């Protein structure tokens, strides 16, 4: 229910988890776009949050019970909420870390989706700039909270692998499923999306890979001026540069050229004018703030139990921690968002699907990763951008493969199948990969 006319390039992970009301999403395109296009052309979707919808100025006056019903009882995904308290209960009643980890992970899933909803509601009252920044902050708040707890526990590799897994999952699994399902629904034609935007987004991902590549190369070529410290210093410097670049990127989208884009709803007839319907926010400003605080606190609480149970779950299930961090955490933690991307593709709105998949990858790689390095710096943790050779090579190859699939501006179910199969190869690789830095976990 976002309300502000924020330009595209605003696509947060959790917002696309609003599966039950995706029909109301606003689409954005250049004013000069051809009116024949049914799928919205979203220029450079990706870094902040999804497109905001138009909201009216009407402020709801809900009771506490009404607010609870709207936020908690209106979404079927919230049926998973009881798994969180159950995980906490098991923590004190049993030593089975495998079950504690699984229940914590499932319990966090609906919280991530509701965080996106509360952020949308608050954005109705803040204006486009603040609304965009809110979504930049809360877009991947679940991953950030888990990462901060892992940093506090000294589990630097878990932080690196979890963030890497989110990027890989979005680029291969989410995008692949969207292409595959959309291709099956529209099997008689090739679905199209904005080729120019996809190329720009691919370039941004390559920039992020560059930031991760040089520390790894410096480490494995043994060419550091000061062994051990040069790699960390380069990582911290590069992280600051990436954050500055990301901030400039947001400023350009939110301030410099917001008038270059106009909201657009799906066209029912090529000769008809499109229009946007104002929508009333469902909760008030203070309700949104309170719910954001409650949900963030609840995610933080569950994240502590989740991180604490990772090692035990690895031993209990006889699964490498790297596989849990790279594969299981992103898949389950972003389940609602994945469903949203698939639904958009099945409605022939591939630009939005790309915003979820590629956009979230950009946000994590250009914001979440360097942010964690800076936070680790402040905490005295030696978190760096050296994700090790195997992991960095995997990310680099993935970006190249995805860029190759996006270069034509079309998709079909076969391309989607290829991306899914690529993800299975990556998953199998991490299952048999022995992390040489296991002690850092």
Curated annotation (Swiss-Prot):
Membrane-spanning intervals of the chain: 70-90, 98-118, 130-150, 166-186, 198-218, 232-252, 287-307, 312-332, 355-375, 385-405, 413-433
Cation selection: region residues: 139-174, 333-368
Keyword Chloroplast: no
Main location: membrane
Stretches of the chain found on the membrane's Extracellular side: 91-97, 151-165, 219-231, 308-311, 376-384, 434-441
NCBIfam families tied to this protein: caca2, cax
Family: Belongs to the Ca(2+):cation antiporter (CaCA) (TC 2.A.19) family. Cation/proton exchanger (CAX) subfamily.
Protein name: Vacuolar cation/proton exchanger 5
Organism: Arabidopsis thaliana
Gene: CAX5
